[in-house]
Each structure stands twice: as structure tokens, then as C-alpha cells.
């Protein structure tokens, strides 16, 4: 043949950045740019078209710029001046040292939403974790975080002609992301070897600079691993249960091994959702390796652990069959100094029940001193949900607390609103965002200025929709003339209502479409134009959620709804930012109490958007009359379908009789003064309470400070207190069953259960404590039963010790009930030690009458 086969050599051409622009490169490698809009705008202005093409990724932008373009920019005085201003701000920010008076924290989460450039998040949980890291950086606390670098991230969504969701997984090119490989002491890329039962999984470690703090990401997609283990970090929530377990071992055990390899030790370990619970397996192994027993080690681990639960339903927790769990975790009990059954029991509601699977959440509860839900109501729901773990106590007596989720103001507040706030608010605002006094200044802003800002944001959203969705709609909807008429129908002067969230069925996206005839009447009223914007993804395995999307798209194509109901595809952080700042009303209709917190409405709040929501999650606490609208928290029907119909009718009626008339009560200047009043009330009375600053401070004040204090108390002097408490617990366990009630003295009518209100009764018990010296507490528990058959605590009255003779302790209480009615009474004995953090820390209880 006259032509031989060509030999090709792969060549990577890296863009050579002129020395004058080096500072841009440095800024691009810290995700700080994502919430500092002078930086984002600077990158955008280098090449607006390319910036859009690169998905607003500054690393990719600088890589793709031609050498000529970069050379020209290096001589552009305006760009250089702006770059130097941003760089000075950036360096000043980084040079602040962390506050050493606050405990240091290691934070573990399966996902982080920092920017749509880094596809390592799927929804609210990830965005919350991302916001938390940004605020930790802004508040200058000593925190580091661990997660995964997913090869495919979470899917991007396209919709077929008939409205079927198509999930596309696109590989991320790690070389084009704002991340760096972590090097070991010898300057080699760090690899963490994580022991699974009889082999190791090898994880590369990457760092994301989130302002002042570091987020370490593990990645198994490398040639050191087999084809079975490379996919561990391919997809967020991807694969089967076996892959999920492998992910959770990597996050928990691999996460702690990563921090060890980097020489990082923190005061508090915060497990964000149960996925990271296995951090405590490795931490126990590490203590046992230093010569402590399991019982001593778990005292130290518990005292420095916080577990945050995000789901309100048992189905949301991960359960693993014993066989599968043993396949990968079988080697750990020996390192922890316990038996296999002991490890399994730490993850069971009913220790000893061989049929019960291992639950990560139960394991987290058993190995963390503190547990919290993510709103007041979710705290209550979690007390109920976990009450089976700590038998002997009622849900309302649980130590499970709550911190209501907030949002990172600099990320979610649009530049236009930030400018308005800075113009009118106190100059300390940035550092004191959760101070309600400062926000009251919104009342001094002229109504007209607020209306103008709102209209600017609406027009921006409408332009964005027209530009961004034209192409995808043309591809999917066939008839171009329909697209043009649809584009024309999007009206910035109409009341815009936004609904953006995961399409899980409990979020009830279908609610609005319960009565189509009534809905058609509302959206086609010429006096009160209104349009609905829907967006959201359904989990690839959630057929019902995908069905909902399909139904909404079908309805939106009917002639009477065309252009009035619009579905926007591929909901991500970029679209979310546009939507929560561009609509007038943010609609949220979950089935109560299934919305643990919900944060999109809080983001809307920061942008003068008014909430209209079911009283669930954060809105149950946030709602104020005259500052938004609410659907009652009461359930009228047990039957969900009937409840849905009632709630839908309520939504229609509030829209028709309150929201639309108020919005369109326009004055001569073209806006509604009544509407602006609601906007101002919402900003002044609600916004300061839902900043991420308030959330971070809550975590310190409610949990981190007391955990760190107790951990240092236990670990001082070679862990002396931890050893002492472990020995004391061991003694109580050994003697518990032999403790006996020697005598009991109470009036006959008390014994008969027939007592008078207001009358005082004296009750005396003599108990043989079997040498446990003051380690026994006794209390009288009175309960009442509600209509649903549930028993609740009415009162708990502690007995006093009035006499000691050797091991015989005489306990006495004076008891009276002021309210007449039907009650239940019992006596509860428990081990008592002032150095325990709460009762559920050592859950031994004996009831008697």
C-alpha cells in the first residue's frame, strides 16, 4: 500500500497565561469566586460568550481562551485594575486566621452544592452542606470537610417530546475543575488505602479551596482499583445497595483515614446524614489501637460526635442485610475490640434480634452523643422516629434537638438586592446578618425602589428563559410557531409563581392540578394575569415522580394552559438562583410533616419573593401574618386524596381572593403598595432568622461548644475521665439486675388508683443499691393518653433520698395532681451520674408500680 497507518501522539496544549494575569488563575482555583460577584463578573467580562459556553467555570474559561485574547487582556488597563481590586479583597479575606476560641470541626457529607460547576450535589442536602462550608469560611471557624469527587456527578435532565425525563450522565473532566490533587510529604499524589474485608480500595484525594477552608474529596476511579471498585465514586446515589455500602465505607472509614494521613485532628466530628456514620468505626479502631478498651473508646468518640438527620421517614434511612454488611465490614469488630454481633447490635433498634438489618442511622445515634433534626417540627418527628432506640423514655424526653436550616445569604441574594441592602443597612451587616435590628431598615427603602428591583429581577428571569430554553424547546416540542407564541406569552408584568424542587411524591407537585377547570379560570382571567413556572428532577428510579413531570408537561401543552404553565428543564444551582430571585411568589405544597426543612423558600425570601406554603419545615417557624401566605397545619382528613383536594381548593381560593387582588391593586406609579408592604414585612420579620450565619451559630451554641468541652474533660490526663465513666457503667451493668426494692409505703387510694385533685400524697421506697452508692435515681412519671391512643408525659417528679443506711437508700416524694382527669402513673428507676450528658447516654430503666 502507498499509505502507511499514521502514528498519532496525544498532545495537551495548556493555555499559557501571561504573567500580568496570573492573579486570575489563582482566584479561579478557589471557589470563593462563586459567592463574590465582583469576581464572577470579572471573569464574565473577559469574554461573555465563552463564559456562557464554559458553564460559568473560570478554570475552563482561562484554559480555552486564545493566546491572542489573553495577550490583549494583559494590556487592558480597566481589566487589570478590576483584577487587582478583586485580588486584594481575596488575599485580605484569606489572610484572616481562624478563631481559636471556637471548637474545630470535621464535617462529613455525601454531597456538597458549591456551584453548578462542581457536579457533586443532587438537591437540598448538598446545597445546604455547600452553604454551610461557605459560611464556616466567612465566619472564620476552624472547619474542614470530606466528601466525594464524582466522575459523573448527578444527572442532567432533558425531556423527550412526550415529557418523559431522560437522565444524562456526563463525565466531569477533573483537569478543568477548581480542584487540586493533594500531595503527601514526599511530594507524591496522596493515595488513601481503605480496608474492605480482604482487600484495599485506593482513593485519590483532591482538595477544593472553599474560601478559607478545605474540602477533601475522595475518588476511586483510577487504575489501582478493580472494575468493581472504580465505580464507587462514579455517581451520587447511583448503583445498587452493595455500591451504596461501599460508598458509605469509603466516606466514613476512608474519610477518617484521609484526615489521619493529612495529620488533621479536630475537636468535633459532624456526620451530616447517616451516610457518613462509619466515621465512628474508624475512630473507635484508632483509640483501641492506642491501648484503650472499646468501652473507653466509645466514651471519647460519642463525646465528640454530632449526627444530623435530614429525613422524616424511616424509608429514607439506609438498611443493610447482615450478609452484605459482613462481606465488607467483617474485619472491623476485631479492631474495635468487640464481637461481630456487638457491631451488628449497634445498628439495630432491637439488639439481639438476628432478623434485623444494620441501620446506619441507628448506628449514628448509638455512637454520637448529640443528634439533631433540621427544623423545630423535624426535631419532634425525629424524637418520635428514634424513640425505639432508647427504650424507657417517651419521644418528648429524647435528647434529640434541632437546628433549623438556613441559607448562605451572599450566594443566594442577587447582586441587585445586595446593592440595595448595602445602601440602606448598617455597615456591619455582612458580619451580623442574623441580627433582626439591622434588617428593619428595609422599611426605610422607598416602595418604588423595591418594586423597581423586583421588576429588574423578573425581566432578567424572563430573558433567561427566552434565551436558555428556546433551543431545548425547539428540539422537543416540534412546531416552531408554537414555541414563538409560547415565548411571547411569558409576561414579566404577570404575577409569576415559582415551584422548584425534587419531584418526590410527598412534595405534591400535582396539587395545583387537582381541579383543572378552576385552575383554567384563574390563569385565564384577563384582569389578573398569572403564570406558573415549574422545574425539578425526579430520581431515576422514582417512576411516580417522573410520571408527575410528564403530567405537568402534558397539561402545559393544552391550549388553555399554553404559556400559563411552563416547565423548565435541568433544575440546578444556576437555574435555582434565577428562579428564587425572579418570581413573585414561591409555592411549596409538601404533605405535612414530610418536609424536614426545605430551604428554597428561604432563598426566595432574601430576594423580596413572598412565600406561599404549607406550614411545614422552616415555614412553620418562619411564617408571620402579613409577610406571606400559609396553608393551615391541621390535617382535616386521614385520607390523603381528600386532604389533597381540600388543600388545592384552599390554594385556589387564597390566590383568587387574597394574592391576585393585592398584587394588582396598582397605584398611579404602577405598583401595589399593599404588595410592597408584604415584601418588606417578609424581609424584615423573617429573613434574618434564616441566614446560614444563624444556623452555624446555632450549631456552635447548641452542640459544638458542649461537645468539645465534654470531650476535653474526658480526654484530659490520658483519658482519665473516659476510663472512670466506662468503669462506672460496667459496674452498674453488672449489678443492675440485683438491685431490689425492699419496701414501699403509700396510701391505699394511691394503690387503688383513685386520688383527689389538689391533695398531697407522700410515697416512700426503700431500695437496696447493692453498693452502687448514690448511682440510682427514682422518679414518678405521670402520663395522659390522647385521642390517637398515644401516651404522653404529663409530669416527672424526682424522689429525694431522705436516709442512707449502708446499701439501703430511702427515697421519698410528695405528689399531687392539680388537674382532674384520667392519668397513668408509674415509677422509673435509672442510673444517675452528673457527668453523663443526658439520660439516653446510658439507657438502663426499670419500671415498677
Regions found by a protein language model. Give the residues of each.
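Catalytic cores of carbohydrate-active enzymes across secretory and cytosolic contexts
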Residues: 1-849
Amino acid at each position: 500500500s502507498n499509505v502507511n497507518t499514521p502514528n498519532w501522539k496525544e498532545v495537551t496544549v495548556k493555555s499559557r497565561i501571561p504573567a500580568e494575569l496570573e492573579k486570575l488563575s489563582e482566584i479561579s482555583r478557589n471557589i470563593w469566586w462563586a459567592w463574590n460577584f465582583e469576581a464572577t463578573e470579572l471573569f464574565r467580562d473577559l469574554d461573555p460568550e465563552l463564559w456562557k459556553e464554559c458553564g460559568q467555570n473560570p478554570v475552563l474559561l482561562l484554559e480555552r481562551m486564545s493566546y491572542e485574547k489573553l495577550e490583549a487582556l494583559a494590556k487592558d488597563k480597566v481589566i487589570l485594575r478590576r483584577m487587582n481590586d478583586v485580588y486584594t479583597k481575596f488575599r485580605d479575606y484569606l489572610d484572616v486566621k481562624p478563631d481559636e476560641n471556637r471548637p474545630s470541626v470535621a464535617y462529613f457529607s455525601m454531597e456538597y452544592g458549591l456551584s453548578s460547576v462542581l457536579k457533586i450535589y443532587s438537591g437540598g442536602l448538598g446545597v445546604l452542606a455547600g452553604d454551610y462550608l461557605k459560611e464556616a469560611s466567612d465566619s472564620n471557624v476552624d472547619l474542614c470537610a470530606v466528601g466525594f469527587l464524582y466522575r459523573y456527578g448527578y444527572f442532567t435532565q432533558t425531556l423527550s417530546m412526550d415529557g418523559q425525563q431522560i437522565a444524562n450522565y456526563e463525565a466531569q473532566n477533573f483537569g478543568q475543575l477548581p480542584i487540586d490533587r493533594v500531595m503527601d510529604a514526599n511530594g507524591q499524589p496522596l493515595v488513601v488505602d481503605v480496608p474492605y474485608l480482604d482487600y484495599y480500595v485506593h482513593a485519590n484525594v483532591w482538595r477544593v479551596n472553599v474560601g478559607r477552608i478545605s474540602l477533601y474529596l475522595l475518588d476511586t476511579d483510577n487504575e489501582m482499583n478493580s472494575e468493581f471498585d472504580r465505580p464507587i465514586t462514579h455517581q451520587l446515589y447511583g448503583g445498587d445497595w452493595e455500591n451504596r455500602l461501599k460508598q458509605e465505607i469509603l466516606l466514613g472509614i476512608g474519610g477518617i483515614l484521609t484526615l489521619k494521613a493529612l495529620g488533621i485532628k479536630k475537636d468535633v466530628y459532624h456526620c451530616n446524614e447517616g451516610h457518613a456514620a462509619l466515621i465512628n468505626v474508624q475512630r473507635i479502631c484508632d483509640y483501641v489501637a492506642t491501648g484503650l478498651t472499646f468501652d473507653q473508646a466509645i466514651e471519647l468518640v460519642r463525646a465528640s460526635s454530632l449526627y444530623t438527620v435530614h429525613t422524616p421517614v424511616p424509608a429514607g434511612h439506609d438498611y443493610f442485610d447482615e450478609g452484605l454488611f459482613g462481606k465488607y465490614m467483617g474485619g472491623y469488630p476485631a479492631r474495635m475490640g468487640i464481637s461481630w454481633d456487638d457491631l451488628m447490635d449497634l445498628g439495630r433498634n432491637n439488639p439481639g434480634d438476628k432478623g434485623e438489618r444494620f441501620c446506619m442511622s441507628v448506628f449514628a445515634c448509638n455512637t454520637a452523643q448529640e443528634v439533631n433534626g433540621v427544623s423545630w417540627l423535624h426535631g419532634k418527628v425525629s424524637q418520635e422516629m428514634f424513640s425505639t432506640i432508647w427504650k424507657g423514655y417517651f419521644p418528648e424526653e429524647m435528647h434529640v434537638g434541632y437546628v433549623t436550616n438556613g441559607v448562605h445569604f451572599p450566594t443566594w441574594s442577587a447582586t441587585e438586592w445586595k446593592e440595595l441592602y448595602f445602601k440602606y443597612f448598617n455597615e456591619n451587616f455582612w458580619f451580623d446578618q442574623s441580627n433582626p435590628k439591622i434588617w428593619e431598615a428595609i422599611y426605610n427603602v422607598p416602595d418604588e425602589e423595591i418594586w423597581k428591583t423586583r421588576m429588574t429581577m423578573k425581566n432578567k428571569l424572563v430573558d433567561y428563559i427566552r434565551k436558555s430554553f428556546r433551543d431545548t424547546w425547539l428540539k422537543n416540542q416540534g412546531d416552531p410557531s408554537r414555541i414563538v407564541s409560547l415565548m411571547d406569552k411569558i409576561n414579566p408584568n404577570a404575577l409569576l409563581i415559582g415551584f422548584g424542587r425534587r419531584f418526590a411524591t410527598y412534595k405534591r407537585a400535582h396539587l395545583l392540578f387537582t381541579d383543572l377547570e378552576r385552575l383554567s379560570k384563574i390563569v385565564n382571567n384577563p384582569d389578573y394575569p398569572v403564570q406558573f413556572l415549574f422545574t425539578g428532577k425526579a430520581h431515576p428510579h422514582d417512576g411516580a415522580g417522573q410520571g408527575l413531570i410528564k403530567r405537568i408537561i402534558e397539561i402545559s401543552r393544552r391550549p388553555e394552559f399554553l404559556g400559563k404553565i411552563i416547565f423548565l428543564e435541568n433544575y440546578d444551582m444556576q437555574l435555582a438562583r434565577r428562579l428564587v430571585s425572579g418570581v413573585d411568589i414561591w409555592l411549596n405544597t409538601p404533605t405535612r410533616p414530610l418536609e424536614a426543612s426545605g430551604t428554597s423558600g428561604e432563598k426566595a425570601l432574601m430576594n423580596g419573593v413572598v412565600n406561599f406554603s404549607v406550614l411545614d419545615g422552616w415555614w412553620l417557624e418562619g411564617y408571620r401574618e402579613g409577610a406571606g401566605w400559609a396553608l393551615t397545619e391541621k390535617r382535616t382528613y386521614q385520607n390523603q386524596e381528600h386532604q389533597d383536594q381540600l388543600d388545592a381548593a384552599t390554594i385556589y381560593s387564597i390566590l383568587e381572593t387574597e394574592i391576585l387582588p393585592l398584587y394588582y391593586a396598582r397605584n398611579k406609579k404602577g405598583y401595589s403598595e399593599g404588595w410592597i408592604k408584604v415584601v418588606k414585612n417578609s424581609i424584615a420579620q423573617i429573613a434574618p432568622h434564616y441566614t446560614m450565619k444563624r444556623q452555624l451559630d446555632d450549631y456552635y451554641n447548641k452542640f459544638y461548644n458542649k461537645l468539645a468541652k465534654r470531650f476535653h474533660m474526658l480526654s484530659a490526663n490520658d483519658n482519665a475521665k473516659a476510663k472512670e465513666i466506662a468503669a462506672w457503667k460496667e459496674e452498674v451493668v453488672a449489678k443492675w439486675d440485683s438491685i431490689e426494692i425492699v419496701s414501699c409505703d403509700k396510701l391505699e387510694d394511691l394503690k387503688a388508683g383513685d386520688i383527689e385533685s389538689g391533695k398531697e400524697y407522700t410515697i416512700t421506697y426503700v431500695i437496696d443499691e447493692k453498693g452502687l452508692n448514690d448511682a440510682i435515681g427514682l422518679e414518678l412519671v405521670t402520663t395522659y393518653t390522647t385521642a390517637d391512643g398515644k401516651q404522653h408525659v404529663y409530669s416527672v417528679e424526682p424522689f429525694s433520698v431522705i436516709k442512707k443506711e449502708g446499701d439501703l437508700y430511702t427515697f421519698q416524694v410528695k405528689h399531687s395532681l392539680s388537674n382532674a382527669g384520667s392519668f397513668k402513673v408509674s415509677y422509673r428507676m435509672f442510673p444517675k451520674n452528673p457527668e453523663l450528658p443526658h439520660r439516653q447516654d446510658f439507657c438502663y430503666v426499670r419500671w415498677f408500680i
